[in-house]
């Protein structure tokens, strides 16, 4: 799916097709930040749904100081690129610093996050409030995770893969392959 930079989309207004161009209004840009260690189908689901709400999505690999990573930033970036190759307009970047600073640098109005079970709520609430305190102009938008992905996470998938568990359908094929290589299977 591509979005031309001049013609953004065609929509129906009062039954007539209207062409909306970039210059007609400000692009609604969202950053979808995360560790993506590695990207899972749960993340892809949020990205695909977010892309229906925003004109521009930037998937940003950021550093969470509380985590130890299995994949390097370069590996995570390559896996994201491969997994999102049918969406060439979705940007993928890495950033080392404050998320809200990055959002400002990218002219993004929103931070997109997926919300899984109730257990996510406290952490996400804390992070959203802190980000708002740091910059009131950047809004956090939550999408409810698809039911299929409600109990998945990168860690649980890595653990299953490490012990030879079948993770088909939970991660994009490139990630499945890379996990097999990492764990020597
Ligand atoms: N489906 C399935 N799993 C999902 C998911 C979905 N839709 N959305 C998130 N997850 C999982 C991830 O796989 C991840 O699992 P893991 O903990 O087992 O790795 C977990 O939910 C949350 O990870 P993620 O969304 O990648 O966030 P994070 O906590 O790793 O990273 C940052 C949070 C990077 C966005 C945050 O630390 C940050 O903003 N860092 C920059 C510094 C900064 O600005 N800090 C101040 C913020 S207050």
Regions found by a protein language model. Give the residues of each.
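Nucleotidyltransferase catalytic core that binds NTPs
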Residues: 19-185
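N-terminal amphipathic/basic-hydrophobic helices that include classical n-h-c signal peptides
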Residues: 1-25
